[in-house]
Amino acid sequence: AAEPYSSTPARPLVMELAQFAKRQRTDGLEDDGGRVQRISAQAVQRICSDQVIIDLQSALKELIENALDAGASKIDVRLKEHGVELLEVADNGKGIPVASRAGVALRHHTSKLEEFDDLQRLRSFGFRGEALNSLATLATLSISTRTKDDATGALLTFAADGGVAKSAPVARDTGTAVSVAQLFGPFPVRRRELQRNATNEFRKMLATTQTYAIICDAVRFTCVNQLAKGGRQVALQTEGGRGGGG
């Protein structure tokens, strides 16, 4: 017989709900008789974000696809503690224009399409405008970027709603680096689950990177993991430059 369907975040989500119920009891909150109420905007954002980014692998997938959409010929994946402390994807693509930076991590903001009919002409991976917004909600998100027309780069840090909390000049080459620190930090149970499964999560991330490297063989990929004791593990390095991919 086929195994019943199971979703990766199901167990942590159940545990989160159990904790919520416990807090209600200990805080002395009374039952309101089942009255239907509007969910707060903050709660909706956190719930939806948890479905877009379910693990480190899905976060990495979204960031690699953003880099490919930017026309990158080089993509560097940098991890700290197998991605538990930090996941960073840097590329040498076209960068994020100044006019687009304020909305780059806002929900349903995208440079890929404006109207539904644009889907017929879409030639990119991402288009929903949800990934970066979800990462801003689930982690500490920062982006450094520069276009060929910029005199200098910019380092953007984001609030939980995806708005730019701070922007500062930074020296860097043309391209973009997206840093995701402390993924699932606002969700203690999910965070502990990630820490316990760090090695398996790393294997899945590496397999994802290898898949894109095989398909997009014109792009040079590297994946480096930095350990707590100062060790540095080069997990993947490809030559790129082949004509068949991309």
Predicted regions and their residues:
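Low-complexity, disordered terminal segments
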Residues: 1-2
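Short loop/turn elements that form and flank the Walker-type P-loop nucleotide-binding site
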Residues: 40, 53-57, 70-73, 82-84, ...
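Conserved protein kinase catalytic domain
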Residues: 44, 48, 102-106, 184
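Bergerat-fold GHKL ATPase/HATPase_c domain
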Residues: 5-65, 69
